[in-house]
């Protein structure tokens, strides 16, 4: 715990008041003025605005968010009667990675999701430890519910953590009776979904227009898949889109090879021509074409998905995938009302240099963490430990 406390203080000293990209500033702007301008999660904007109400900027938010994460790691020692001497060096090694030393200072919804997921699952583990004590059990379960519900609302795929938590809850509560386990698991999952939906509803600005975040996100995925399809296989025809707008579809087909990359979806945003053409084609036509790709050209669809996930899971050149973000950068009209200014100072340069030491090491390999998780899960199951 001492190592983690020292790590938290070192991280805060190196990163406060935090690192903000355009998305960070845009959501802080929404939270400060209680408006909706982007399709980012309303709950995250509200959280940033809430902490900004106490101390201007993101210093307090970063501190609380990081304290949640480091506190959750420290709480793991309470799950066993005694802690191995290995805990201190392992904790020190973890603290030195960019994921803990730098990422905790980045004001991104992804980091909040990760911290909430870890905190929620640690609460669930403590609930298992004190299960016979109903009062303490429900306190831990309430903490898990709040954190997992919040996490599910700030990241598009955040609900996955809730699914895994529901499986764990069912296992813990079953006590050898599978029907009881299913009831607890389903009940826990429904509670997270309901609580998360309530959080988002309450965080919505009172006079904001109808939220289009989900539909906008789906449309972006549709565009990305279709552009990828015509890039990987020029023979694939966009007939359904062409029937709705032949001129726009022609531009899309011409520009797709230059704008598609499995690395990031952002490249499409840099080409005004293809952006305008995509906007000209109706949602109905694009969706019909997307269904055609998925169900009538499934092999090509899977090729597109494979290319995307190849860069997600095992990027050939990690430097191209924004492995770290430092400083503050956003349009001046968004930063000025928040009393923010562009920042990339010497300390940011040094942190960036520090992060690059890890780029081509196992620290940035997803496979390492999958392997560690699998080994630990197998060990705990073999030892019959929660």
Regions found by a protein language model. Name each.
Residues 22, 105-112, 154:
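Short acidic/glycine- and proline-prone juxtamembrane loop motifs at membrane-interface regions
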Residues 42-46, 54-71, 88, 103:
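Loop-to-helix entry region of an early transmembrane alpha helix in multi-pass inner-membrane enzymes
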């Amino acid at each position: 715990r001492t190592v983690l406390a020292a790590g938290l203080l070192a991280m805060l000293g190196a990163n406060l008041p935090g690192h903000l990209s355009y998305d960070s500033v845009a959501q802080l702007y929404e939270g400060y003025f209680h408006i909706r301008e982007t399709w980012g999660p309303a709950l995250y904007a509200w959280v940033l605005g809430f902490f900004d109400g106490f101390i201007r900027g993101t210093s307090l938010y970063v501190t609380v968010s990081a304290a949640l994460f480091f506190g959750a790691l420290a709480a793991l020692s309470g799950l066993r009667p005694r802690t191995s001497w290995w805990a201190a060096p392992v904790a020190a090694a973890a603290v030195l990675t960019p994921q803990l030393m730098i990422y905790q200072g980045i004001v991104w919804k992804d980091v909040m999701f990760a911290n909430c997921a870890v905190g929620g699952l640690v609460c669930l583990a403590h609930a298992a430890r004190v299960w016979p004590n109903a009062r303490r059990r429900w306190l831990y379960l309430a903490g898990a519910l709040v954190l997992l519900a919040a996490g599910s609302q700030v990241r598009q795929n955040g609900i996955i953590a809730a699914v895994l938590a529901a499986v764990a809850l069912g296992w813990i509560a079953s006590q050898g009776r599978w029907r009881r386990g299913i009831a607890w698991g389903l009940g826990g999952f429904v509670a997270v979904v309901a609580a998360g939906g309530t959080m988002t509803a309450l965080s919505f600005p009172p006079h904001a227009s109808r939220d289009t975040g989900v539909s906008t996100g789906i449309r972006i995925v549709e565009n990305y898949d279709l552009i990828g399809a015509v890039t990987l296989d020029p023979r694939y025809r966009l007939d359904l889109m062409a029937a709705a707008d032949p001129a726009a579809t022609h531009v899309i087909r011409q520009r797709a090879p230059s704008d598609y990359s499995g690395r990031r979806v952002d490249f499409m945003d840099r080409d005004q021509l293809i952006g305008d053409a995509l906007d000209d084609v109706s949602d109905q036509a694009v969706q019909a074409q997307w269904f055609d790709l998925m169900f009538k050209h499934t092999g090509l669809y899977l090729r597109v998905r494979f290319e995307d996930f190849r860069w997600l899971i095992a990027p050939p050149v990690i430097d191209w995938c924004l492995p770290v973000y430092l400083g503050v950068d956003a349009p001046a009209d968004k930063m000025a009302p928040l009393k923010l200014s562009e920042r990339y100072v010497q300390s940011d340069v040094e942190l960036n240099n520090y992060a690059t030491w890890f780029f081509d090491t196992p620290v940035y390999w997803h496979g390492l963490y999958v392997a560690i998780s699998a080994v630990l899960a197998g060990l705990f199951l073999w030892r019959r430990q929660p």
